[in-house]
Amino acid sequence: MNTNKNTVFDLKSKFKPSGDQPQAIEKIVKGFKEDKFKSQVLVGATGTGKTFTMANIIQSLNCKTLVLAHNKTLAAQLYSEFKEMFPDNKVEYFVSAFDFYQPEAFLPKTNTYIEKNSQSNNDIEMLNLSALNSLIERDDVIVVASVAAIYASSPPDDFFKNRVAYKKNQVIPIKQVQYELVNLNYQRNDVDVTHGRFSVKGDLMEIGPGFTDEFNYRISFFGDEIEEIAKIDPLTKQVITKLDEIVLPGAEVYLANRDTLEESLKRIKDELTETHKNFLKQNKLIEAQRILERTNHDIESFKEFGFCPGIENYSRHLELRAQGQTPYTIFDYFDKDWLLIVDESHMMVPQIRGMYNTDRSRKETLVEYGFRLPSALDNRPLNFNEFLSKTDKKLYVSATPNEWEIEESQQITEQIIRPTGLVDPIIEIRPTQDQILDIEQELRKQIANKERTFITVMTIRLAEELTEYLRNKNIKVAYLHNELKTIERFKILNNLRKGIYDVVIGINLLREGLDVPEVSKVLILDADKPGFFRSDKSLIQIIGRASRNVNGKVIMYADTITEAMDKAIKETERRRNIQIEFNKKHNITPKTVIKPIALDLSKNDADINIDELISKNKKSKEKIDRTVKKLREEMLAAAKNQEYERAAYIRDIIMELEANKK
C-alpha cells in the first residue's frame, strides 16, 4: 500500500468561509489536531453550508476521509459536490452495487426457501472498485459511501496481491497476459471493450480497466515483447497519452485468493463434516442431506472456476479468518490517521446500529435448517462497537443530532449563521378548522407573489385528496410520493422551481434534494399528531425547507401545542434571534439563495420516456443492451464536453433500464 505522506488536499472554490463557517472550521480542526478529541459534533442549521465546512476541515486535517451518507441519492449529491471542490484529488463513490436485492432466506412456518435474487449495477461495481484501488495507491482520497461501507469487502492484502503490472519492453507472451487477466475475472470481448473486458486483435490488446470507463489501455506487442503501452479514448480509440507502465487490479471487488484456495477448501470440508455429524446426532436428516448437497456443489464450483454463487458466505474460510473475527471492510483500506464524517448522523447512526442484528437473525435461520454452514454468520456487517473502533477521528454532522452523538462527543460546534444572511423562518400556528380553505387562500397569495410552497401531510389518502382538490381549483400542484423514480422526482422539483408547478405535496419532505430557494412557505398539516414525522427533530428538518428564501414562513395546522412542536418552535426562535443579531452587528441584508436551475433536459436527445422504452423492449434483453450501449456512448460524449448534468441524467436512464432487464 502507498505510504507516501505528502498528501495535499487542494480545495478549489470561488467562495471563502463566511457566516459561522470560519469559527466552526477552526474549532473542529483544533479539536482533532491539538486537543486530540476522538469524536465531535457539528450542529449545522439548514443552509449554513455544512458540506463546504466539511471540505475545509478535510483540507486542514490533510488526511484520507470517509464520508457516510444514509442513502445512495444523498451520497451521489455529496460525491458530486466534493468532486467539484477537489478536482485535483481523488473523490470516490462507494455504495451497494445492487439495483435490486432480495437476500437469501428461509421461512420455517411455511417451509419456504427464498433464493437470493439480485440485479447488479456494473457502473456502481466499477466505482466501488475504483474507490478501493485509489485507497491502495494514493493518500489524497475522499470516499463518499452509504451503509455499504460496514459490509464485508475484499481484504486489502488480497486486493493488493490481485493486481498485475505490465511495463514497456517487458518480455511476456500475449497468451500469458490473457491468462493473467482471465484469472482476475476480466472477460474477453473482441467487439465491445468496456470496463472489466479485453480484446485481442493480432499483436494489439485493448483492456478496459475494472475501475474506470473513462479510458482503456492498449498494449502493442512485437513478438513476445511489449513494444508500446497507451491510454486511449474508449470511443474514438485515439491515444490520450503513452505510458511506461500500467497496474491493473482485478475486474471485481471480491476475488478468491487462489494461493490459499486449497487451504480454504480444506477448512470448508472440515466444517461440513462437523455440521453434517451434528445434524445426524439431532436426527435432523433433511437438514443433514441439504447441507451436504449444497456445500459439496459449491466446493466443486470452487475447484473448477475458483468461484461459486453465494461466495460471500464462505468469506471466513477464503480469508482464513478465525471464528467471530471482525470481517474486512473498506475501513481497513484507510491508514491509522484518517477522518470519518457521518453526515445526517441523526439518520445514519441508527441505520448502522440496526444492520448487524437484522443480518444475523436471517442467517441464523438459514444455518439452523441446513441451508448454510455456521461460518456464514461471519459474512456480516460490522457491529456498532466494531464500527466505533475503526478510527480515532469521527465528526458527526446534523441539523438535529441525536442524544447519543452529543454524549459520545468531546466537543459540540454550532453553525447557525448562514453566509447569505438568511434567518430561520417565522412560525405560525393555525387551527385545523377550515384548514383546506385557509391553505387555498395562502396558495393564492403565494402564486400572486410568484413564490412556491411545500405542503407536508401525514397520510397518502390526505395527500391524494388534497392534490385532487387543488387541481380542481386550478392550482398547479404535484404529489411527491415514494414510488417516483429518481429522474421523475428530479423533474418535479425542477418544474416547481421553474413555476410549472406552484406547490408540491408530500408525506416525507425530509428527504435530500428538497433545498428549493423558490419555496418561501411550508405548510405542515397535523402538526400536533404523534409519530416520527412530527417529532421535534423532524419538525426542525421540515422548517428548514423554508430557510433558503428571504420571505421564509412556516404554518403549522394544529389544535394543541405538543412537546415536539414546542421544542421545535423554541429552537427555531433561538437560532433566528442569533441570526438577526449577527446581521445587525455586521450590517448584513439577507438574500435569497441563488441556485441555477438544472439543465432543461426535455429539449435534449437524452430525454427518454423510460417506462415506454422498457415496455417496448421488455421481451428483448438484447434490445435493452443495444440501447444501453448507445446511451453509454452519449454519456461519455456529454462528459467529455463537460455537459455533466446531461451525462448524469443519461447515467440515471441507463441505471433504470438495467434494473428492469428481464
Swiss-Prot record:
A motif (Beta-hairpin) lies at residues 97-120. GO terms for biological process: nucleotide-excision repair; SOS response. GO terms for molecular function: ATP binding; ATP hydrolysis activity; DNA binding; excinuclease ABC activity. SMART domains: DEXDc (SM00487), HELICc (SM00490). Keywords: ATP-binding, Cytoplasm, DNA damage, DNA excision, DNA repair, Excision nuclease, Nucleotide-binding, SOS response. Residues 31-419 form the Helicase ATP-binding domain. The keyword Nucleotide-binding applies. Residues 625-660 form the UVR domain. GO terms for cellular component: cytoplasm; excinuclease repair complex. ATP binds at G44, A45, T46, G47, T48, G49, K50, T51. Pfam families: Helicase_C, ResIII, UVR, UvrB, UvrB_inter. Residues 438-597 form the Helicase C-terminal domain. InterPro entries: Helicase/UvrB_N (IPR006935), Helicase_ATP-bd (IPR014001), Helicase_C-like (IPR001650), P-loop_NTPase (IPR027417), UVR_dom (IPR001943), UVR_dom_sf (IPR036876), UvrB (IPR004807), UvrB_inter (IPR041471). It is found in: Cytoplasm. Forms a heterotetramer with UvrA during the search for lesions. Interacts with UvrC in an incision complex. The UvrABC repair system catalyzes the recognition and processing of DNA lesions. A damage recognition complex composed of 2 UvrA and 2 UvrB subunits scans DNA for abnormalities. Upon binding of the UvrA(2)B(2) complex to a putative damaged site, the DNA wraps around one UvrB monomer. DNA wrap is dependent on ATP binding by UvrB and probably causes local melting of the DNA helix, facilitating insertion of UvrB beta-hairpin between the DNA strands. Then UvrB probes one DNA strand for the presence of a lesion. The beta-hairpin motif is involved in DNA binding. Belongs to the UvrB family. This is UvrABC system protein B. It comes from Malacoplasma penetrans (strain HF-2) (Mycoplasma penetrans). The gene is uvrB.
